[in-house]
Amino acid sequence: MVEVEEKHYTIVKRNGMFVPFNQDRIFQALEAAFRDTRSLETSSPLPKDLEESIAQITHKVVKEVLAKISEGQVVTVERIQDLVESQLYISGLQDVARDYIVYRDQRKAERGNSSSIIAIIRRDGGSAKFNPMKISAALEKAFRATLQINGMTPPATLSEINDLTLRIVEDVLSLHGEEAINLEEIQDIVEKQLMVAGYYDVAKNYILYREARARARANKDQDGQEEFVPQEETYVVQKEDGTTYLLRKTDLEKRFSWACKRFPKTTDSQLLADMAFMNLYSGIKEDEVTTACIMAARANIEREPDYAFIAAELLTSSLYEETLGCSSQDPNLSEIHKKHFKEYILNGEEYRLNPQLKDYDLDALSEVLDLSRDQQFSYMGVQNLYDRYFNLHEGRRLETAQIFWMRVSMGLALNEGEQKNFWAITFYNLLSTFRYTPATPTLFNSGMRHSQLSSCYLSTVKDDLSHIYKVISDNALLSKWAGGIGNDWTDVRATGAVIKGTNGKSQGVIPFIKVANDTAIAVNQGGKRKGAMCVYLENWHLDYEDFLELRKNTGDERRRTHDINTASWIPDLFFKRLEKKGMWTLFSPDDVPGLHEAYGLEFEKLYEEYERKVESGEIRLYKKVEAEVLWRKMLSMLYETGHPWITFKDPSNIRSNQDHVGVVRCSNLCTEILLNCSESETAVCNLGSINLVEHIRNDKLDEEKLKETISIAIRILDNVIDLNFYPTPEAKQANLTHRAVGLGVMGFQDVLYELNISYASQEAVEFSDECSEIIAYYAILASSLLAKERGTYASYSGSKWDRGYLPLDTIELLKETRGEHNVLVDTSSKKDWTPVRDTIQKYGMRNSQVMAIAPTATISNIIGVTQSIEPMYKHLFVKSNLSGEFTIPNTYLIKKLKELGLWDAEMLDDLKYFDGSLLEIERIPNHLKKLFLTAFEIEPEWIIECTSRRQKWIDMGVSLNLYLAEPDGKKLSNMYLTAWKKGLKTTYYLRSQAATSVEKSFIDINKRGIQPRWMKNKSASTSIVVERKTTPVCSMEEGCESCQ
């Protein structure tokens, strides 16, 4: 049993009294319930099995109680009994639980007839029950105001408050017994006990507060406002300048009424005012009142998604007050906003803005600012912008959302010459309507003095000590300005290789990767988020088996890298050996020159030549392993640690547009960027994503609108290259020479919901194909037309574009090296590509690469859509990031359930109980269950096939997460082999089900009659028919945000 030092823990009885927590009473209550249910005599000893059961349940309840007390929660007797009841059900003891509930109801009725309650005489002559919890609450408010506590009250302070409350209650009882007592007398006792305990400052503030309240009751407001009603509780609020004012609940009701005006049928301003008022205290700061209001709205999002817009409205109004000095209700808001924008830009050098922004026509730009677009944001979007994206000066935010979008747009149009005002307005209208969003580094830095706008950097590390540390130093510089990094380490010699200069033996690549890991965590991204990188190693490297274990939680910490990502760079030959159950040879790179640069049939020829040198004794440092054994170890580590990710070397190179000027040696932090890198070039890519949701009209893609969006987006991405601040000369050289950009998408799952298409269907596959083809068509065309205006990129001559290849054409090249049976890719198309081919032949291309689908974790949160091409993770879950925790309900699901009359508190409890899944909720129709399958309920083949259809059109890669609901080695192997055969170039995270789930202790299992899943004989999900497409598979047995 959990040992409890009882003097340190108190709980609250039903009459409000604080008493010591006594775990023996839980055991005794459980014993009584068991004896009653099992008809056991009180005098007879308990059977051993029952005694053990009672002890186990007591242990679990005590553990939960202590956890809640340690978090600063006030635990009541009722709450403990709820926990006991819940644990009885979880333990399968429903009969005991029922008797326990009956016993509780009887005791409740008996208590209702009791008359031994002290009465308080209020100031208006009325009476109320004496409640010590109100004393405790008043004390806590006084302590918080005096000690200037923000956030949760520290446990030590709560303990002091509990002790004081006990002494005050004892005084009240000893002085008055069961007689009625005046409220003023209780407050006198509170003052006395504060002084006796030595809390003089708290007592002083408490006395001043009582005097202020007395004056407010005695006098009318001097400005002619209505008199404070004595019965209405008020709080003293401290303004930033030190002055104070009194706040009533009716004041909060007015604030919430304004915020809720757009949603009168779905939101309740009175409810929010009640909730917010409960969290106030005397002496509270003005910004804490705003926080309490926002938290009240935020707490209701899970049951009604419209509260996300209420919370956003409240935060936006607070932002206006901070930035503009007026609230959202000010009739002159628009004019104040325009004036502030112009002053902000004109004084921008003081605020780290690019001084060239002053050269714009600020009057014209200010007229375009549209504050009504702020209403598009949900709470998560505004909070993300507020916490990390808006420009700050001495702790004060200088931007509203619309000024932020305009600052970014102005920064992106600086190279547009005489047309820069036109393009700044055009860019603003695109960004502020959520049609397209640049990646986070661009949002951070566009229009700023140091305009580092690029998302991804890829570099290779040479087998030379000075170059190793140069790359590590470069990593620090790149990460400082919010870039995500991919490092190729394959060229560094393996453990045991001879160092010719010293005649010593190399320690291999692992110690150097450890140094890179420590550098990544030492440099955070512009002070706004953690630095992030991914290291790549080909799986023929002799240190590869050690590389597999870099993310393990056990072993030598000097050979562990817990803070960076790892990825395997795998040639096709390995999978061919795996298919034939052949052997695989590991080499030190210094013994096999040219192997890392080779791919396809050339790699196979060279690799086999080196294997013959092993047999002849020319190469002595090597290791032979069974390909199948190594593959199992790769998958085992992937499942255990989430790393190394699986990426495919040959399709990344064979299908590369730039095969004439180098080799793709690795991918980036999020595995979607595939660019050449070398000792003289650090590959750079600039990212942005189209919001598909804004391009659906009449239940189909609006092709004309999408064409316009893509054309402007490609222009923005190309501008980034010329406007960018380059931390290293190698990055500048690569970006200006090849001008790679990565246009992606987000909101794919949202669109499927709007079109009533299940992700697990052929319809989703076809839509993925159609959508990707349209985007590729207009993206390539836009880059070519931009070449007409601005000229081709420097290394265009000899590229695949120049040789007449489009991305779709390169699949045939992959088939030539792999064999058609290993390239199971649909190559159909619907559009006539002749105009695109003719335009490229005539004008060339402005950008070497044009498309890549990044994860978009952050920017999709800003605009309120699902990430990238990801399926819905859960229909109700809590998301954590640097801005805090956010409850995420699936608004599309709730809308459907409302239409069917099924959305209620019970359904919300069901969603929590079943961890955000619908499959076992009996009253949800099967057609909705199929439409709203979560990521772990969709067979991986569907996700892979949808991605395969995209990948055929995309010239770089797709950041693709894969999901595995249960540990299954064969299924895991088949999943990745299918991805390889389906032509994917890379994969990203392997997501597995978390061991934890939604908090269920507040769910009344008995009342709702939920049958726990462990008691089910037949799942409600067994009647669902999910369309599945047969895919040939092998039968072998068994978070960065730079791209976001």
Swiss-Prot record:
Q: What family, per the record?
A: Belongs to the ribonucleoside diphosphate reductase large chain family.
Catalytic activity of the protein: a 2'-deoxyribonucleoside 5'-diphosphate + [thioredoxin]-disulfide + H2O = a ribonucleoside 5'-diphosphate + [thioredoxin]-dithiol
Task: Give the regulation of activity.
Answer: Under complex allosteric control mediated by deoxynucleoside triphosphates and ATP binding. The type of nucleotide bound at the specificity site determines substrate preference. It seems probable that ATP makes the enzyme reduce CDP and UDP, dGTP favors ADP reduction and dTTP favors GDP reduction.
Matching PROSITE patterns, A to Z?
ATP_CONE, RIBORED_LARGE
In this chain the ATP-cone domain maps to 9-111, 118-217, 235-325
Listed name of the protein = Ribonucleoside-diphosphate reductase subunit alpha
User: Site positions for Allosteric effector binding, renumbered to this chain?
Assistant: D463, R493
- Enzyme Commission numbers on file: 1.17.4.1
Q: Where is the signal peptide?
A: none
Q: Where is the active site?
A: N668, C670, E672
Q: How would you classify this enzyme at the top EC level?
A: oxidoreductase
At the highest ranks, the source species' classification is:
Bacteria, Pseudomonadati, Chlamydiota, Chlamydiia, Chlamydiales
One Pfam family name is Ribonuc_red_lgC
MF (Gene Ontology): ATP binding; ribonucleoside-diphosphate reductase activity, thioredoxin disulfide as acceptor
- The source's superkingdom equals Bacteria
For the site labelled Important for hydrogen atom transfer, the residues are C456, C685
Keyword vocabulary terms for this entry: Allosteric enzyme, ATP-binding, Deoxyribonucleotide synthesis, Disulfide bond, Nucleotide-binding, Oxidoreductase, Repeat
Annotated GO biological processes are:
deoxyribonucleotide biosynthetic process
* Organism (species): Chlamydia pneumoniae (Chlamydophila pneumoniae)
Protein function = Provides the precursors necessary for DNA synthesis. Catalyzes the biosynthesis of deoxyribonucleotides from the corresponding ribonucleotides.
Site (Important for electron transfer) found at: Y988, Y989
Question: What does the record note on quaternary structure?
Answer: Tetramer of two alpha and two beta subunits.
The record ties this protein, via SUPFAM superfamilies, to: PFL-like glycyl radical enzymes, R1 subunit of ribonucleotide reductase, N-terminal domain
Which positions are annotated as binding substrate?
Answer: T440, S455, C456, G484, N668, L669, C670, T671, E672, P855, T856, A857, T858, I859
Q: Where is this site: Interacts with thioredoxin/glutaredoxin?
A: C1040, C1043
